[in-house]
């Protein structure tokens, strides 16, 4: 189980410099109007971090809270496309450092007993890191 923690640490350390290497125009370019830009994908990862943070906090004291979000609405309403890239990256980094701290705390507890959205916290933590890596690959892929 600790493997995903190490993967998460590596992602947090590497992702900011990987993003900084992307040309500003390419980072904001939308392949088609209905699809997210790389910048908006970063915004989606911010929304995911915030939503998952609430899941992990609430599931420790509530019985199986149901916490969902509409990702397209969140992305549009947050106006990530017009936001400063550095501000988004700083927010992403702060949220994920806090999630990493929380994950390290949670792995000492019985994660198979606590649930959120009918899924164990153990599953949700590993899935969060896999989701982050999936979108990291999307962002880093050549357009």
Question: What kind of feature is each model-predicted range?
Answer:
Residues 7-11, 18, 76-112, 128:
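Acidic/histidine-rich alpha-helical segments that form the ligand environment
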Residues 14, 18-21, 25, 55, ...:
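Amphipathic, soluble alpha-helical interaction motifs
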Residues 1, 26, 41, 77, ...:
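Residue-level detector of alpha-helix boundaries and kinks
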Residues 1-4, 51-94, 143:
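Short, helix-capping/interhelical loops that line the mouth of catalytic, cofactor-
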Residues 1-24, 47-58, 130-133:
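Alpha-helical bundle segments that constitute or directly flank the non-heme di-iron/ferroxidase center
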